[in-house]
Amino acid sequence: MKKVLALVVAAAMGLSSAAFAAETTATAAPAASTAAPAKTVHHKKHHKAAKPAAEQKAQAAKKHHKKAAKPAVEQKAQAAKKHHKKAAKHEAAKPAAQPAA
């Protein structure tokens, strides 16, 4: 009952929940004091190997690779670029097939 009252009072005062956890585990700790304390393991941070300094470039030069220059093509009208005309059929040049009489 006292723990509940302490939690309500502490919540009203605006204390963090981490403080509550510390208080509640501190009261249960004497019962578990017979267990061996856990070893603290220090983890080593992995450091990346230093790369040689690259030549500094403009930001656009890094991202955009220029294509090989093509020889200049003769300028055409816009319609001529888009529409390819099919070869015109000349019907008049051929004599009409006459039915066999």
From Swiss-Prot:
Subcellular location: Periplasm
Listed InterPro entries: Acid_shock (IPR023497)
Keyword Transcription regulation: no
A Pfam family hit: Asr
Propeptide: 22-59
Keyword Cell division: no
Family statement drawn from the similarity comment of this UniProt entry: Belongs to the Asr family.
Name listed for the protein in its UniProt record: Acid shock protein
The organism of origin for this protein: Enterobacter cloacae
